């Protein structure tokens, strides 16, 4: 959770329980973001909500605050065992579930409520032991939650609050049957507080809300533009021959504090990682086949600043809350227009500014018209000077040549490239575009 001061509304203005206010204020959260200011009065009145807001706007804190407050003000059902959750928060990815749990920790400490995680790719027995020690709030992905349910580790008879986060992403990943399976085993919608949040309130998302919620109020925070007004967008048209050199030259010119590079395939991501690691950049690789423990370690290194650049497929485009990402590079333009918005939305979050640089190369330039139509504006274009591109670049590393360097390279330097063997880049690759004649 990131401290923001975007509205004049304070959390203390809403009549929250003192323990909730205490947890928020100890982490420095005093003022609300727009989605928090709109959602909390609705939720605190007991009304269900279907909220639409871009990632990075503070919706996680909105539903966590409402969930904790609801559990504190609503008596637990009579006969409920400590192993039976009172609230359930469903997320589309393991990373998002973990991030929600981490964001909940200040409120767990101040309220005394217990939370547990349930997601695949992690030890079943370890999660089972945590659940058996008592749980008020269950946070996780639908598949593992259903596994525990079918093993009768818990039931859902005493659920008093439900959160469905990134609902549109749930549809994209094919989890809708799992969601309906879980909803049908909970108390009636009128007997629980229901919260749905989504980047888009599409027809299918609204249909889900109508089916499993109690007349939810729609709360929408529309951005001025789909891509966020704090994000500086830039587009290059590199040849396939120049593409990698342009990326490395721009990285050396921009020298980003924290950057994510997106490519469309696992193989392309591995190629980018190999070139940047060879050039002594502190770079991590995040693709779909990375084991969960390694994913968590890579993300922690990136968040802590031990890794400066993360190369990723769209597995990281949504559901990850990584603060202070300064640059996003679209090495490949995505095939899905919405993925462009979600990718560059990793930067320019919570009031910060960001820079997005995209390559319309020979292979993926065909995707550009649809993307620009979707975001309703043309992406500003820059030319580059081929003679200004770096040429003395080392050969790429072999991804599997060294177990120690697989997936992450934290041995690079922020102050020099290639161990100081190459002079710092002096020539700017950008070339001014000629002005159009009237």
UniProtKB/Swiss-Prot annotation:
Compartmental location: Cytoplasm
Locate the motif DEAD box: 165-168
- Give the range the annotation lists for the signal sequence: none
Q: Which reaction does it catalyse?
A: ATP + H2O = ADP + phosphate + H(+)
Cellular component, GO annotation: cytosol
Q: Which domain of life is it from?
A: Bacteria
Any idea which UniProt keywords this protein has? ATP-binding, Cytoplasm, Helicase, Hydrolase, Nucleotide-binding, RNA-binding
Q: Motif Q motif at which residues?
A: 9-37
- Give this protein's Gene Ontology molecular function annotations: ATP binding; ATP hydrolysis activity; RNA binding; RNA helicase activity
Q: Does the keyword Magnesium apply?
A: no
Protein's UniProt keywords contain Nucleus: no
List the InterPro entries hit by this protein, alphabetically.
DEAD/DEAH_box_helicase_dom (IPR011545), DEAD_box_RNA_helicase (IPR050079), Helicase_ATP-bd (IPR014001), Helicase_C-like (IPR001650), P-loop_NTPase (IPR027417), RNA-helicase_DEAD-box_CS (IPR000629), RNA_helicase_ATP-dep_RhlB (IPR023554), RNA_helicase_DEAD_Q_motif (IPR014014)
Q: Where is there biased composition of kind Low complexity?
A: 406-423
Instruction: Give the matching Gene3D superfamilies.
Output: P-loop containing nucleotide triphosphate hydrolases
**UniProt xrefs under NCBIfam families:** PRK04837.1
Under the subunit heading, UniProt states: Component of the RNA degradosome, which is a multiprotein complex involved in RNA processing and mRNA degradation.
Protein name, as recorded? ATP-dependent RNA helicase RhlB
